[in-house]
Amino acid sequence: AEHKLNRDRNPVLLSEEELQRGDISMELASRMMNRTYYETEKIRRVLQTIFHMVNKGHQVFVVGTILEDNSVKGGTGWAVELAKLFNRPLHVYDQHRRHWFTWKDSSWQEDEPRICYNTFVGSGTRYLSDDGIVAIDKLFADSFSK
């Protein structure tokens, strides 16, 4: 079943063939994320879609929670793991710690990132805090203000 779009500006609808290019074994995904996925078909579609987002953008920005094992909580963490795998500039706003972090030298380092590439990806938790909203607004203001 198709998903209902919440917005109509620049949607990209992926064909079955395009989705398959982002396919990955659930075993590998579970191992990379240090967790187990049960609703495999639903989760597979989400992971396939996230693959295309990260593959099309260069710099990756995520809002979520960095866990002790350096992964990021939830499905959002898949965008983070792919960005690490693809060697992309990667930044996470950790809502719990209320700060931006950049993945550098195999660890999270506090940072104040800017959008500085022609293409970027935004991903994140569906539980966006007021702080998270402010962080996104500030990221755009700092990146694009003259």
Located regions from the model:
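Acidic/glycine-enriched connector segments
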Residues: A1-S145
